[in-house]
From Swiss-Prot:
Subcellular location, record wording: Cytoplasm
Purpose: Redox regulated molecular chaperone. Protects both thermally unfolding and oxidatively damaged proteins from irreversible aggregation. Plays an important role in the bacterial defense system toward oxidative stress.
Gene of this entry: hslO
Post-translational modification: Under oxidizing conditions two disulfide bonds are formed involving the reactive cysteines. Under reducing conditions zinc is bound to the reactive cysteines and the protein is inactive.
Keywords: Chaperone, Cytoplasm, Disulfide bond, Redox-active center, Zinc
Listed name of the protein: 33 kDa chaperonin
Organism: Staphylococcus haemolyticus (strain JCSC1435)
Length: 294
């Protein structure tokens, strides 16, 4: 099986910037950890793919967090990614599933809802943050991220996201693309791009047919027009740790920690993103209190 990866490219002599990714393994890892049902898997997987692609636009140690909250039954979908191809995600209600929609597809819109927003927070280093948001206009997520780029980042873009789920709940295929029009692009280039996107098959179908990220970009933009700049590995990766959660406990304050010692004789923390559990003994919490008062 081909491992997940991202492709960055230019097209039409630099007038178009394009990114594509295969994310089947990463979405499968998240599905296994959270035991998501098919509709939730599709919504989470689409959000993960978009977040991963947006992360690949960052540099160095920059990272971003995306929160999708359409006020639907699934609750919030939260994903974060960095510039190195690492992504992780979770959903509030992982066991969300509905009958297929009228098109015979997983009903992501019904799960996500259409009465909320996409929020993006980019950590660009030096304690500097960029924050943007846009309303959810579709609930299918591809159109919603397209709208986010147009309104919040003023970048005309097309975002395609797809997840296919097997009858046993495992992930059959996942991936997507973000294609962006660069400033100064000719009208005829934009028209060609619009026509190509309007006539293409759904991205999940392209992946199911075995198309690689390069193949997806060639299919949309035309093989002669695509210039591959870089490929990078992608994976589900959680950076949680015993120490990070201990710092989070410290942030709760002395009174709360005293309660944990007296009433619970310790503490347990569970990472939302990966499900890992961290246990803290009474002695550890007492040492933490002592260090806070030192």
């Amino acid at each position: 099986m081909t491992h997940d990866y991202i492709v960055k490219s230019l097209a039409f002599d630099g007038e178009i910037r394009a990114y594509a990714a295969l994310t089947t393994e990463s979405v499968q890892e998240a599905q296994t950890r959270h035991y998501t049902w098919p509709t939730a898997s599709a919504a989470m997987g689409r959000t993960m793919t978009a977040t991963l692609l947006m992360g690949s636009m960052l540099k160095g140690e920059q990272k971003l967090t995306v929160t999708v909250d359409g006020k639907g039954p699934i609750g919030r979908i939260i994903a974060d990614a960095d510039a190195e191809g690492n992504v992780r995600a979770y959903v509030d209600k992982p066991q969300t599933h509905f009958p297929l929609n009228e098109q015979g597809k997983l009903d992501v819109r019904r799960a996500v809802g259409t009465d909320g927003s996409i929020q993006v927070v980019k950590d660009v280093g030096m304690k500097d943050y960029f924050s943007g948001a846009s309303p959810i206009v579709s609930g299918e997520l591809g159109e919603d991220f397209t709208y986010y780029f147009a309104t919040s980042e003023q970048t005309p873009s097309s975002v395609g996201l797809g997840v296919l789920v097997n009858p046993d709940n495992s992930i059959k295929a996942a991936g997507g693309f973000i294609i962006q029009v660069m400033p100064g692009a000719k009208d005829e280039t934009v028209t060609k791009l619009e026509n190509a996107i309007n006539n293409m098959q759904p991205v999940s179908k392209l992946i199911e047919q075995g198309l690689t990220p390069e193949g997806i970009l060639n299919e949309i933009l035309g093989e002669d027009n695509v210039q591959i700049l870089e490929t990078m590995q992608a994976q589900f990766e959680c950076n949680c740790s015993h120490e990070k959660f201990l710092n989070a406990i410290k942030g709760l304050g002395e009174a709360e920690i005293q309660d944990m010692i007296k009433e619970d004789h310790g503490a347990e923390a569970i990472c939302h993103f990966c499900g890992n559990k961290y246990n803290y003994s009474e002695a550890e919490l007492e040492d933490l209190l002592a260090s806070m008062n030192a």
